[in-house]
Amino acid sequence: MSETVTQTETDQRPATARSLGAEEKEAKSDEQFQQERTIKGFRWFIVIISILSSVTLYSLDNTIVADIQPQIINTFDELDKLPWLSVAFLVACVATNSIWSKIYSQLNAKWLYLFCVVLFEVGSAMCGAAPTINTLIGGRALAGLGGAGLYVGVMTLLSVNTTKRERPMYIGMTGLTWGVGTVLGPIVGGGFAVSKVGWRWSFYINLFFAAVAIPIYLFMLPSFDPRPGVSYKERLAQLDYLGTILMIGACVSGVMAINFGGQIYPWDSGQTISCFVVSGVLFIVFGLQQWYCIGTTKENRTFPCQFLARPAFIILFVQTASVATVFFVPIYFVPLFFQFTRNDSAIDAGVRLLPLVCFIVAAMILNGALMSKFGYYMPWYLVGGCLSLVGSVLMYTIKLGTSTANIYGYMIILGVGGGMYAQASFAVAQGKARPREIPVATGFISLAQLTGGTIALAIANSVFLEKASAGIMAVVPDASKETVQSAISGASSSFFQTLDPDVREAVLAAVTHAISQVYILPITGAAMSISLAIFMPREKLFVASDTGDRDGVTPLGAMG
């Protein structure tokens, strides 16, 4: 029955009931996490810029493929494999996120982060040099694997190299670098797509970053060992290998189902249903394996089940997934709207994102600075959720004739709302977690962000394709389904050019209506954020209390 003892009970046992050596190792680990920042001045400036820049690359790689897909199709002539370009990256990110956070809690953060950067760069090099689309897909998967570890590593390095008071500010800065990469992705991709060097340099450009950043990581980034005094053999033996395999299998089949359903295969096809069934079965087996600690221990499970017993972490998880829905959907569909309705190029459509992303980034930075200063976090979720709801509803009302100025205004409202709490959960979770749980807590929130964004985009894309296809075929009944889907995906623009002006306007109205329908997802996410914010405590998390407790917070649910 000892395996059912809670973490709190374990911590309250007398020393005689626990290994003295284990207690000493945990104390050392906690001291490592709580230590003051050891690097300052110009060295710290160079290190933090290098770390945050890797987030730019990660976010750039998320959006850069969208605008070079037509050129990739023309190179390899395999339209049926087009969805794999995004699915491979997303599958690798989602499936390995929790695993990376667990590894970061065992191994040296500096060297593990460096390994992930190299992995990401190797994947990018594979994509750039790919002789076949299968190699390109493999490179995307490898880049996603390294990118997931890189992102968890950034959050871990920021948490262990900053004080608790300044941590929200630096985590807020990840929003700035994420925004820069998100905006640059379509612009850089579109620029290379129409240039003489070609789309392959959209991936090769990442290698220049590695040439500059890796020496900085090697010689200036402080080393951080989360488990000093523990042999690497013991650390590796404590990883949950069975849970890792089950989770990867469940995530891969699940992401494939929601991304391929309605696009490559009908939702009721055997292929789609099989993926859902396999994913469901594997998730059930994974849950049982984690609950009963089969092939692992309670402390070493892949998924941080201990957070499921803490209401605060459950709320933070759902809040993070909800806000990911709020800002990921418009980031992908705003450029699409302008490409269809204003005949924008890929570069121009990417620039149209600036009002949205700039205000998301500004709100993220403001959140990091003010939350560090005043300590309260609940108002950010409540006010941010309200503004996100207003902005999402306004985006839902967009018609073919809606002015560009109005659309920019809607985007600004949505950007401010989403940015107010987009990254806040990382700092809040790290503040609420025990020091040695910080890497796992970081991965827990990162998993929510990736899962929310992945599921939202998959559903939004399916809704758009189905609604747009049905609307276009109602206007042009003679067009084949394959021709319509090819035109919607961007693989062929000749379809729209052959239409009469009146018919083209009706088709664009159908496309605009289909795009407006995807904003039901951000509306739902924002409404969920408001509902959950009401149940969040009115507490100060980042300001030291008079009693000198570690967090300086009141218990969950306290209203003072």
UniProtKB/Swiss-Prot annotation:
Topology of the protein relative to the lipid bilayer: Multi-pass membrane protein
Record-annotated membrane-spanning stretches: 45-65, 84-104, 111-131, 141-161, 174-194, 201-221, 242-262, 275-295, 313-333, 346-366, 378-398, 409-429, 440-460, 515-535
Biological source species: Aspergillus terreus
UniProt-annotated location(s): Membrane
One of the record's GO cellular component terms: plasma membrane
Record-linked Pfam families: MFS_1
Alphabetical UniProt keywords: Glycoprotein, Membrane, Transmembrane, Transmembrane helix, Transport
Function: MFS-type transporter; part of the gene cluster that mediates the biosynthesis of pleosporalin A, ascomycone A, as well as a third cryptic naphthoquinone derived pigment, all responsible for the coloration of conidia. Seems not to be involved in pigment biosynthesis although its expression is regulated by the cluster-specific transcription factor pgmR.
Null allele phenotype: Does not affect the production of the naphthoquinones derived pigments.
Compositionally biased spans, kind Basic and acidic residues: 21-31
Superkingdom, taxonomy of origin: Eukaryota
Induction (free text): Expression is positively regulated by the pgm cluster-specific transcription factor pgmR.
Residue ranges the record marks as coiled coil: none
Residues bearing glycans: 300, 343
Stated name of the protein: MFS-type transporter pgmG
Family listed: Belongs to the major facilitator superfamily. TCR/Tet family.
Region (Disordered): 1-32
Gene assigned in the entry: pgmG
GO molecular function: transmembrane transporter activity
